[in-house]
Amino acid sequence: FAIMNVCQSGDNFISSTDLYGGTVNLFTHTLKKLGIECRYADPADPSNFEKLVDEKTRCFYAETLPNPYLRVFPIKEVADIGRKHNIPLIMDNTASPVICKPIEHGAAVVVHSLTKFIGGHGTVIGGCLVDGGNFDWTADPKRQPLFNEPDMSYGGAKWGEVVPQLTGANVSFAVRARVCLLRDLGAPLAPDNAWGLIQGLETAPLRMKQHCSNAEKAVDFLKKHKNVERVIYPTLHEGDIAARSKKYLKGGNGALV
């Protein structure tokens, strides 16, 4: 939904090369069949994103703490490049908002797989979109046509204009996703799953603290094990990646090793 909310056939978006495998399949194969092109940029150098921008580029996409290499993404650096071109940065923050808050660093939209750490008990399946309310969808109408051209499926509404007028908030992304994509493609959260997620949210900060502690103990053990050649964890990176870990991971270094 996040990509289809800004892209249509003939458009492109730029994604980090550090991605979960299922997301790579979605971007490389499924969206391609819909006429949406994904261009991949190596996040080791944030300027790689800018090099791929053209007049049809609608958004940037990345994961906060991508599996399996756990190289923290340069959120602010790429978000700033995007805003220079009126391009929003969409962040997959499945690593959890307890660990990192991408919107505070300039991301326009955050997506989560709620099944993982927010649910936390293996009992629900779900995802969510979080509109940061910090992106002006009308600043460059040619860059964001889906928010500035009349939507004839909804009485000619121009989402970038009408949503702030009606709500007093800059949440055009969230509203359009709900009234257009959810209307046409489905994927509403089941009530029982919603209830399970509420239970998970109550303990998320406590669970993430323990997850991170457990992971760090596992790292210490594996580093010393004679049969282990390499251990990957955010605290073990060096240089720019290590600096990003300290900058963006304020609630712990994550549960993945």
Protein language model annotation of sequence segments:
Residues 1-224, 232:
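Conserved PLP-enzyme active-site core in the AAT-like
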Residues 216, 232-257:
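Conserved glycine-rich beta-strand-loop-beta hairpin in the small C-terminal domain of fold type I
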Residues 190-192, 226, 250-254:
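Short gly/pro-enriched beta-turn/loop segments at secondary-structure junctions
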